[in-house]
A protein has these predicted regions:
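Flexible, glycine- and charge-enriched loops at secondary-structure boundaries
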Residues: 11, 42, 46, 97, ...
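Flexible, non-catalytic linker and terminal segments flanking ANL/adenylate-forming cores
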Residues: 1-16
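Conserved AMP-binding/adenylate-forming core of the ANL superfamily
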Residues: 14, 34-86, 103-108
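Extracytoplasmic/periplasmic beta-strand context in beta-sandwich domains
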Residues: 32-33, 69, 132, 158
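A short N-terminal helical cap/helix-turn-helix that marks the beginning
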Residues: 12-34, 51
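Aromatic/hydrophobic pocket-lining residues that form π-stacking "cages" and hydrophobic walls in ligand
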Residues: 22, 84, 134
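Structural core segment of the AMP-binding/adenylate-forming
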Residues: 63, 91-166
């Protein structure tokens, strides 16, 4: 008996990574709109998106994140979410998506369960005050040196990156 199901083998799987696919799209359609956020009054072409993604990916690496590290995003749908997703892919980080409806206890569980090293979080969304919940979970944030957070409740968490809300 087979332990797995054999599916269709045609068409073949696409080779490459998500980050490589974005770079290929930017080469093929540099001036075509790739990301539109009406709520943020933002429109980016593939070339502009790739430039912002690569700048963010470089920023993640300069902060000391390394390929294989877990970076979480806790935010409603906004441009920064997409930028974070692609930037994580471009520099080999593992993206952990946190439900924007989660409260502090669920955030605590999620961050600890998967060993998140960095958290990218919006300031707030609807009634959820992400910054306040994060500070309650890791009160050491206020006195920590940027990039050197040490928190008792989430030992793996070293950095919190706040999305400014615009």
């Amino acid at each position: 008996m087979l332990s797995h199901v054999v599916g269709a083998t045609s068409p073949p799987l696409i080779e490459g990574t998500i980050g490589e696919a974005l770079a290929a799209a930017a080469r093929t359609w540099p001036d075509v709109e790739a990301l539109v956020s009406v709520a943020q009054n933002l429109r980016l072409t593939y070339a502009e998106l790739l430039a912002r993604v690569d700048a963010l990916a470089c920023g993640f690496l300069r902060l000391g994140l390394e390929p294989g590290d877990r970076i979480a995003i806790w935010s409603p749908n906004k441009a920064e979410w997409t930028l974070t997703q692609y930037a994580a892919a471009r520099c080999g980080l593992i993206l952990v998506t946190i439900n924007p409806a989660y409260q502090a206890a669920e955030l605590d569980y999620t961050l600890n369960k998967v060993g998140v090293r960095a958290l990218v979080a919006a300031e707030a969304f609807k009634a959820s005050r992400y910054c306040e919940m994060t500070e309650a979970l890791a009160p050491e944030i206020a006195a920590s040196t940027p990039g050197r957070l040490r928190t008792a409740r989430v030992p793996s968490l070293e950095m919190v990156i706040q999305i400014d809300g615009t």
